Amino acid sequence: MNVAEFHQKVEQVWQQIEEKIDDEALSIDTEIHGAVCTLTFDDESQIIINKQEAMLELWLASKLGGFHFAFRDGEWVTAEGRSFWTHLEEAFARHGEQISF
């Protein structure tokens, strides 16, 4: 994957997240600035998803900790093979919201 494809794939993830939050009418503020997508919950807690261009990775930070994802076989996964979407759903739950991607 080249850098342009990387950015396109991450931006698709961000778009999916925004659309799902809107579809579910969740009270979560979504802000994207440069390489960082910030999801802010009612209690002011946050999930941060950012691009790591040099490594072609997607990073996720939440109350559960920090995780790194590489794009393999058509999906974002950790080195252990856990899906980005699984981690994100668990992070939402930890922040008090139920969502399914």
Curated annotation (Swiss-Prot):
Superkingdom of the source species: Bacteria
GO biological process: iron-sulfur cluster assembly
Record-level GO cellular component terms: cytoplasm
Keyword vocabulary terms for this entry: Iron, Metal-binding
Pfam families per UniProt: Frataxin_Cyay
UniProt keyword annotation of Cytoplasm present: no
GO molecular function: ferric iron binding
Function: Involved in iron-sulfur (Fe-S) cluster assembly. May act as a regulator of Fe-S biogenesis.
Family note: Belongs to the frataxin family.
Protein name: Iron-sulfur cluster assembly protein CyaY
